[in-house]
């Protein structure tokens, strides 16, 4: 595979939070049982003036800061999300304009449930590797919704991260050693046009959906690269909740030291398309030169994208040029359920 890597990355997380106890109280549920079952304590909530576009813009600006490049050289911007503000009006064009990348570029909004952001990374890898563009930007961001009283309401959250892909060795903070995808037609989670909330297959979302795809993608990339779990310093997986993430990591043989930096769900919730991009951003915030990372996304419907990544010495030069993911995670203000339903537009008049 040609030399292709990450030259900049940035993240964004809204400051508002709601605790599991606050939601459970309204529905008469046992918060301790929910926290234990999901391994989630609280989740992020976007303010009324935040949506996928504003989250993507903030993450993109932070990525440009770390990359230290002229945004006009970005030849492609892809925003992966299942909560684009408009059905017809691209989020990607708004982001490109906001960072000063227009007009000489291609842009598109992507959808593949929670893995649309990583699909964008693969697309940028292809365009950069072919020489068609100098830099590409891929963003995974969402303001996820869960129906009132549904299990998703305890986890569906907001946040995102952006990655700038390039091929100049002296600019790369991390190199892609390889990528692999695993895709099938698996109807575990869906939402039709015009519907406010998604529907899901309950327990069917586990073994035949999430675990089948994540584990096969992880095994596929390791077979392709000739590696084992011992070759990786860090790993990150899609995290609809903390329980699935930890089970997937342990079933592959990863230790707590390897998977803990990528696990943000307990204090963030499930950011859908932003989940793996945000988890990876936190790993990069902590990683040293030479660290090897296994990243595996998952999108319902269903598919997983896997990446084998090695961090370069340049990481230490850029990590402090933009807010770190944990700094954004720790910048928080708690709200009650009444404010939450107001902010999320759940009160229908």
From Swiss-Prot:
Protein name: Hydroxymethylglutaryl-CoA synthase
Pathway entry: Metabolic intermediate biosynthesis; (R)-mevalonate biosynthesis; (R)-mevalonate from acetyl-CoA: step 2/3
Enzyme Commission (EC) number: 2.3.3.10
GO MF annotation list: acetyl-CoA C-acetyltransferase activity; hydroxymethylglutaryl-CoA synthase activity
Protein task: Catalyzes the condensation of acetyl-CoA with acetoacetyl-CoA to form 3-hydroxy-3-methylglutaryl-CoA (HMG-CoA). Functions in the mevalonate (MVA) pathway leading to isopentenyl diphosphate (IPP), a key precursor for the biosynthesis of isoprenoid compounds that are building blocks of archaeal membrane lipids.
Family membership: Belongs to the thiolase-like superfamily. Archaeal HMG-CoA synthase family.
Reactions listed under catalytic activity: acetoacetyl-CoA + acetyl-CoA + H2O = (3S)-3-hydroxy-3-methylglutaryl-CoA + CoA + H(+)
Subunit structure: Interacts with acetoacetyl-CoA thiolase that catalyzes the precedent step in the pathway and with a DUF35 protein. The acetoacetyl-CoA thiolase/HMG-CoA synthase complex channels the intermediate via a fused CoA-binding site, which allows for efficient coupling of the endergonic thiolase reaction with the exergonic HMGCS reaction.
Binding site for CoA: 203, 243
InterPro entries: ACP_syn_III_C, HMG_CoA_synth_N, HMG_CoA_Synthase, Thiolase-like
NCBIfam families: HMG_CoA_syn_Arc, PRK04262.1
Record carries keyword Transferase: yes
Membrane spanning residue stretches: none
Keywords carried by this UniProt record: Acyltransferase, Isoprene biosynthesis, Transferase
GO terms, biological process: farnesyl diphosphate biosynthetic process, mevalonate pathway; isopentenyl diphosphate biosynthetic process, mevalonate pathway
Catalytic residues as annotated in Swiss-Prot or TrEMBL: 82 (proton donor/acceptor), 114 (acyl-thioester intermediate), 238 (proton donor/acceptor)
A Pfam family it matches: ACP_syn_III_C
Binding annotation for (3S)-3-hydroxy-3-methylglutaryl-CoA: 30, 114, 205, 238, 247, 270, 300
Enzyme class: transferase
Coiled coil location: none
């Amino acid at each position: 595979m040609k030399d292709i890597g990450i030259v900049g990355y940035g993240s964004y997380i809204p400051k508002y939070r709601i605790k599991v106890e606050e939601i459970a109280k309204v529905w008469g549920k046992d918060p301790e049982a929910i926290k234990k079952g999901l391994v989630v304590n609280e989740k992020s909530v976007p303010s009324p003036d935040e949506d996928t576009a504003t989250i993507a813009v903030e993450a993109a600006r932070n990525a440009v800061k770390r990359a230290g490049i002229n945004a006009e050289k970005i030849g492609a911007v892809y925003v992966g999300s299942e909560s684009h503000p408009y059905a017809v009006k691209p989020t990607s064009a708004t982001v490109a304009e906001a960072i000063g990348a227009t007009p000489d570029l291609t842009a598109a909004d992507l959808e593949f449930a929670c893995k649309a952001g990583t699909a964008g990374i693969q697309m940028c890898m292809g365009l950069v590797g072919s020489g068609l563009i100098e830099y590409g930007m891929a963003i995974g961001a969402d303001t996820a919704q869960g129906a009132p009283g549904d299990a998703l309401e305890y986890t569906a959250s907001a946040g995102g991260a952006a990655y700038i892909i390039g091929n100049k060795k002296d600019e790369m903070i991390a190199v892609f050693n390889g990528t692999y995808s695993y895709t099938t037609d698996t109807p575990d989670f869906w939402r039709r046009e015009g519907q406010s909330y998604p529907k899901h297959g309950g327990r069917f979302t586990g073994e035949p959906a999430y675990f089948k795809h994540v584990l096969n993608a992880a095994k596929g990339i390791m077979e392709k690269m000739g590696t084992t779990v011992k070759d990786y310093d860090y790993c990150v997986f899609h995290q609809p909740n903390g329980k699935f993430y930890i089970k997937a990591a342990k079933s592959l043989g990863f230790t707590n030291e390897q998977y803990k930096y990528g696990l943000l769900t307990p204090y963030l919730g499930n950011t859908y398309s932003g989940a793996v991009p945000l988890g990876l951003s936190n790993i990069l915030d902590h990683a040293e030169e030479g660290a090897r990372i296994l990243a595996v996304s998952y999108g319902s419907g269903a598919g997983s994208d896997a990446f084998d990544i090695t961090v370069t010495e340049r990481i230490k030069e850029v990590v402090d040029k933009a807010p770190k993911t944990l700094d954004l995670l720790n910048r928080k203000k708690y709200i009650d359920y009444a404010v939450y339903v107001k902010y999320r537009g759940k009160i229908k008049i």
